[in-house]
Curated annotation (Swiss-Prot):
This is YcgL domain-containing protein APJL_0712. Disulfide bonds: none annotated. Gene3D superfamilies: YcgL domain (3.10.510.20). InterPro entries: YcgL-like_sf, YcgL_dom. Residues 4-88 form the YcgL domain. It holds the Pfam family YcgL. It comes from the Bacteria.
């Protein structure tokens, strides 16, 4: 199995938003509007998409395919948890 390393960057503007690119510090394939929205990328790590470890919120195969076709993958933050809904679901039978 071949190695497909990618560089992972976090956004300083939005917590939980990550940008994956094929090579460290190469953002030519990332549209200018996205770069402006993302902010100055903060390097997190290099990651082997073909390795045994899986990404937590994205599938390795999807990230690799996006990088190969469009040159980058943008991972959006998870939706905020609805605390009221969670509370009500947990306390349904206690009234």
């Amino acid at each position: 199995m071949s190695t497909h390393l990618c560089a992972i960057y976090k956004s300083p503007k939005r917590e939980g938003m990550f940008l994956y690119v094929a090579k460290r510090d190469q953002f030519d394939s990332v549209p200018e509007a996205l770069r402006q929205m993302f902010g100055k990328p903060q390097f997190v790590m290099l990651f082997n998409l073909n390795g045994e470890k899986q990404l937590k919120r994205s599938k390795n195969e999807e990230v690799l395919q996006a990088i190969q076709t469009q040159g980058f993958f943008l991972q959006m933050p998870p939706p905020p948890e609805n605390l009221l809904k969670t509370f009500l679901e947990q306390n349904r039978g206690e009234a």
